[in-house]
C-alpha cells in the first residue's frame, strides 16, 4: 500500500514540470554515458544517511560495476512520491530506476512514464519466472512495464490461544476456517463470549480502513470505479452492494458488539491491538507476524488462514511493490537496470541469496518472529529462489505449522479465489473517503450506509476523478 497521496496532476504537473526544466536547464533525455563511456544507471531512493543500509548498497554497487564494466551505478536521492513524480516525469528527469507501488503502477503505465521491459526480461530469462498474477499488474496489452519486487495477499491472522479456548481449533492443529464474512462475525461473537475481549479488530484511520474495506465490498459484488469509452473514470460505489458491505461493518459494532471501543484505529494501532490480545482476529498479510513481535506475542500463539468469501464472490486484495524504468531510458540502460535489479531481487538461488536468506530467517527465529508463513511471492515455482526461501522457512519454523497451514495452502493454491489489485486511480483518496464512512457507521448507530456512500461517491467523483487528465 502506498503512503503517498495522489494530487491533481493537470495544470500543477505541467507548470511544475516547466519550472523544473527552466531551473535545471536540462533537456528531456536521461544522461546515458559517463566520461569513461560507461552506461549510467541512476537508481532512485538511494540512502542518504550513513549506516548499514548505505554500506550494503555501496558494496553491491562495487560488486556490480566490477562484474559489469560497461555500466556505472549513480545513486539518486529522490524517493518516489506522487506529489513530485509527474513533474519530474514530464521534465524527463526521472532516475533510470525508481520504486513505486501496485496502487500507482497502472497510472504510470497509462501515462507513458515507464519503459517497455518485455524483450529484455525475456532475454535475461526473467519473464517466465514472474508470478502470472503479478505479471498482470505490471502489464498492458501483453507488454510488461515494471519489475515486481514484492507481493502480498490478505488472509486472516488469529490468536491461537483464543481459538483453542473457544473450541475453534481442529484436532489436527488447524483452525476452523470462517468461509464467509458472516461466519467470521459469528466466530468473533463466540470468541468474545469465551475470552471477554473483542473478537475482531478493523482499521478506520489513515486510509487503512478504506483500503481493507475495498476487498470486502468486492466480495459483496461492489465496484468502485469504471472507465468509460471516452477514457474518463466514473465512481460507482453508490450501489446496494457497497452499502451491504458497509452495513456488515456497522453490524460488527451495533449488532454483534465484537469490536474494540476505540474507533480510531490506524495501521500501528491495528497490530498493537491484535498483538496485545486486544482482539482475537485481524485481516492481515504474510508480514503480520513481523508487525506484532514487539508486543511479545509468542510464535505459537499466532496463526494465519484464508480470507473469507462474500455473498457474491471470493476475492482478496493483492498488493506489492515494483521498480519501474524511466521511459527515457535507452535500450542499454534497460539492459543494465534489469541486471542491477537482479542483484537486489533475484529469482535465482545464488550463493549470496542463499547466505542472506538463511541468515535472515535464522535471525527472525532468534528474535521471536513467527517463522512459518509462506507469503505470496512475485516469482513462480520456476524460481529457485522461491524454492530455497520455502526450504528455509521449513528449516527455521518456530511455531506449529498447522497454525498457518490454511494460509500457506491458500497462497499456493487459491482454489477459485480471485486476486484483485488495488483500485487503478486515486486509490489513496478513495481510502480516505471510505475511512470517513467507516468511522461514521461505528460511532453513529443511526448512520445509513446508503446515504453515506451516495455522498462519498459524489465527493470522490467531483474532487478527484473529474480532475484526472490521464
Regions found by a protein language model. Give the residues of each.
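Glycine-centered hinge/linker elements that transmit conformational signals in sensory
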Residues: 183-190, 230-263, 293, 303, ...
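Conserved N-terminal structural module of periplasmic/extracytoplasmic solute-binding proteins
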Residues: 2-111, 122-126, 332, 348, ...
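Short, solvent-exposed loop/beta-turn-alpha elements that line the ligand-binding surface or hinge
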Residues: 115-130, 173-177, 200, 222-244, ...
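Hinge/lid segment of periplasmic solute-binding proteins
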Residues: 101-155, 164, 179-187, 212, ...
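Extracytoplasmic/periplasmic solute-binding protein
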Residues: 140-149, 154, 164, 182-234, ...
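Alpha-to-beta junction loops
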Residues: 71, 89-100, 113-115, 197-198, ...
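C-terminal lobe and pocket-closing loops
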Residues: 288-298, 312-317, 324-432
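Short helix-initiation/N-cap motifs at beta->coil->alpha
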Residues: 76-85, 103, 179-183, 261-275
